[in-house]
């Protein structure tokens, strides 16, 4: 089984066999040998050898290869979307949007490099000041399972454009998507060694993260893993560490005129991708009183009608399975712990089959829970908090170590002005779902949500370092010498 891509060739791994499974059917989706520490070492060495030639290649030549990658993604959209759906459980309609986002990322990344990290010149009295940007070298990219194509792509594309070479370690839950994506890069004409793929589980990831020949590590995933990486690289300023992690995101509901619109945006915020987006709303702040009661009743009514089904079902469902049966069981357990602490289920979550990843969208009123845990439950479990004043809602919304996304649904622009000035998050939306984001804008947060803005416009910033030069085409003795110098 040749499932590793090293030095431009598909090769067999020498580590243990592992498999990914379709969470909606439990069928094996992919199987192969993992990369051992020796395989990882070969991949890093390959990337190191390729770095000099790739970084010396003309910027436009690098961009042409990346543009071919985007064109081929569009050609292979259905096949890649099917791979995404099979391994993640997300419906095909949503998987197709992920592939489209992967292709769109290329143009945005090229524009970002030119505007944020390109070359700038300024004349001086005795020469010219030049600002250039240089690639770091060999970077490790760790991808998540929820967007196994789009999110690693948000690191890989800007890294390659800047002239870095890459060793890619995808999630062990979505290796087939990684294989399909790297095949597109290969078809686009990427030179050997520029992008290497190491498949595997925890041991493969540890071997790559601990490798002394990487110059940077770009990670999208859980806050727990990201925090461990942050600790690991403490005291190593030579490593560029870019982290995009999770959030315990708040959505504050105001007394709006259009209740159905508010319910729609709340459902999109909480349950899109079966709640498996880092920007999904985890805490829904609803006003006390008659309006809040009416909103909650409608929210529960529409939520109760949401069905989850296999990724290729016809008609297509709003939600698919979560990533695994284990993840589904953890969500049900999280709900049970909240109930033990005083939460009141409005719609209780159940796991349809212990072998599968299907859970229903759930709502729990946690207003009465003292010391509500500051945790990200990565799935369709919405926690409702009733509030009395907007300032009360904002204070409680900010009571988190995370700071990824936040949203406000309100008709009054003055309420929005107050909210955006006082809420703490990297993505703050008004009358839009919390998981709505522009690829042309920074994507990321504060606190435990990360330290950079990966997977969007600002990714160019951590893919290259600035090099400042003062230059003159002629070497001449200055007309005026410093005191104490005699020629």
Curated annotation (Swiss-Prot):
Its EC number is 1.2.1.71. The keyword Repressor does not apply. NAD(+) binds at residues 221-226. GO terms for molecular function: succinylglutamate-semialdehyde dehydrogenase activity. The active site is at residues 244, 278. SUPFAM superfamilies: ALDH-like. Keywords: Arginine metabolism, NAD, Oxidoreductase. Pathway: Amino-acid degradation; L-arginine degradation via AST pathway; L-glutamate and succinate from L-arginine: step 4/5. Pfam families: Aldedh. CDD domains: ALDH_SGSD_AstD (cd07095). It catalyses: N-succinyl-L-glutamate 5-semialdehyde + NAD(+) + H2O = N-succinyl-L-glutamate + NADH + 2 H(+). The keyword Oxidoreductase applies. One of its GO terms (biological process) is arginine catabolic process to glutamate. Catalyzes the NAD-dependent reduction of succinylglutamate semialdehyde into succinylglutamate. Belongs to the aldehyde dehydrogenase family. AstD subfamily. This is N-succinylglutamate 5-semialdehyde dehydrogenase. The lineage of its organism: Bacteria, Pseudomonadati, Pseudomonadota, Betaproteobacteria, Burkholderiales.
């Amino acid at each position: 089984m040749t499932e590793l891509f090293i030095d431009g060739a598909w090769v067999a791994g020498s580590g243990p066999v592992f498999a990914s499974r379709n969470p909606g059917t439990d069928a094996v989706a992919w199987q192969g040998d993992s990369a051992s520490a020796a395989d990882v070492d070969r991949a890093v060495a390959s990337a190191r050898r390729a770095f000099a030639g790739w970084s010396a290649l003309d910027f436009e030549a690098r961009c042409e290869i990346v543009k071919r990658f985007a064109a081929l993604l569009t050609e292979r959209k259905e096949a890649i979307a099917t791979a995404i759906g099979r391994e993640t459980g997300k419906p095909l309609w949503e998987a197709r949007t992920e592939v489209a986002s992967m292709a769109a990322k290329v143009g945005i990344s090229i524009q970002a490099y030119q505007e944020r990290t390109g070359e700038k010149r300024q004349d001086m009295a005795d020469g010219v000041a030049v600002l250039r940007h240089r690639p770091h070298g060999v970077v490790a990219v760790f991808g998540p399972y929820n967007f196994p194509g789009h999110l690693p792509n948000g690191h890989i594309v800007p890294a390659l454009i800047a002239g870095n070479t890459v060793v890619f370690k995808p999630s062990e839950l979505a290796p087939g998507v990684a294989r399909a994506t790297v095949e597109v890069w290969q078809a686009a004409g990427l030179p050997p060694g520029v992008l290497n793929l190491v498949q595997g589980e925890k041991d493969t990831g540890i071997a790559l993260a601990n490798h002394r020949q990487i110059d940077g590590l770009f990670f999208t995933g859980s806050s727990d893993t990201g925090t461990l990486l942050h600790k690991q690289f403490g005291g190593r300023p030579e490593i560029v560490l870019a982290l995009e992690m999770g959030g315990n995101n708040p959505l504050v509901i105001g007394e709006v005129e259009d209740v159905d619109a508010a319910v729609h945006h709340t459902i999109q915020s909480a349950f899109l991708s079966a709640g498996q987006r880092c920007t999904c709303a985890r805490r829904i702040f609803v006003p006390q009183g008659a309006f809040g009661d009416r909103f909650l009743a409608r929210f529960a009514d529409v939520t109760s009608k949401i069905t989850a089904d296999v990724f290729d079902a016809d008609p297509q469902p709003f939600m698919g399975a979560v990533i695994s049966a284990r993840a589904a069981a953890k969500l049900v357990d999280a709900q049970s712990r909240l109930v033990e602490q005083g939460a009141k289920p409005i719609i209780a979550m159940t796991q349809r089959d212990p072998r599968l990843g299907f859970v229903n969208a759930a709502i729990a009123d946690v207003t009465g829970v003292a010391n509500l845990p500051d945790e990200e439950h990565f799935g369709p479990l919405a926690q409702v908090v009733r509030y009395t004043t907007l300032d009360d809602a904002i204070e409680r919304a900010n009571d988190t170590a995370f700071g990824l996304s936040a949203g406000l649904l309100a008709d009054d622009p003055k309420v929005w002005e107050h909210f955006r000035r006082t809420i703490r998050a990297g993505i703050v939306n008004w009358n839009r779902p919390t998981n709505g984001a522009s690829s042309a804008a920074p994507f990321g947060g504060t606190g435990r949500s990360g330290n950079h803005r990966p997977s969007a416009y600002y990714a160019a910033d951590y893919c290259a370092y600035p090099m400042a030069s003062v230059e003159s085409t002629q070497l001449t003795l200055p007309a005026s010498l410093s005191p104490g110098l005699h020629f």
